[in-house]
UniProtKB/Swiss-Prot annotation:
Organism the protein comes from: Pseudomonas syringae pv. syringae (strain B728a)
Binding site residues for substrate: 9, 41, 73, 87
Site (Transition state stabilizer): 17
Stated name of the protein: Phosphopantetheine adenylyltransferase
Gene: coaD
TM stretches of this protein: none
Record's function text: Reversibly transfers an adenylyl group from ATP to 4'-phosphopantetheine, yielding dephospho-CoA (dPCoA) and pyrophosphate.
């Protein structure tokens, strides 16, 4: 059985992330969205809320589960019996960092392969950082995130 781990901070999960998960759910037996605690990134939403939002966005996909983690990704992959890391590449600028990460993960978890998917063109420009910035300035984010995420961002930035 192929069990893929899609790690990220997902602060917040966007339509680009959702698209990648939907496509992965057709390619793999099981998809685990691994929501990283990432305290050094000082996330806008606490881990529990990011997990809940990811569950809401993917609840229509029966072979997808969402789990929060705060350990080393290689250790978490072993705990989850994952044999693949899935990462998205939006642009060439993402590649250098992702390439380094894949090589480090290969050293730490040699039995887990790293695979990259590019986003659908309509989502290739979306990033969680941009979505947060637009929301903070009162812009319309409904094109970029699921309604539950838009609501959470609106509530977070109420003035």
């Amino acid at each position: 059985m192929n069990r893929v781990l899609y790690p990220g901070t997902f602060d917040p999960i966007t339509k680009g992330h959702g698209d990648l998960v939907e496509r992965a759910s057709r390619l793999f037996d099981q998809v685990v969205i691994a929501v990283a605690a990432s305290p050094k990134k000082n996330p806008l939403f606490p881990l529990e809320q990011r997990v809940e939002l990811a569950r809401e966005v993917t609840k229509h996909l029966p072979n997808v589960e969402v789990v929060g983690f705060s350990t080393l990704l290689a250790h978490f992959a072993k705990e989850q019996n994952a044999n693949v890391f899935l990462r998205g590449l939006r642009a060439v600028s993402d590649f250098e960092y992702e390439f380094q990460l894949a090589n480090m993960n290969r050293q730490l978890a040699p039995d887990v392969e790293s695979l990259f998917l590019t986003p659908s063109e309509r989502y290739s420009f979306i990033s969680s950082t941009l979505v947060r910035e637009i929301a903070a300035l009162g812009g319309d984010i409904t094109k970029f995130v699921h309604p539950a995420v838009a609501q959470a961002l609106t509530e977070r930035f109420k003035r």
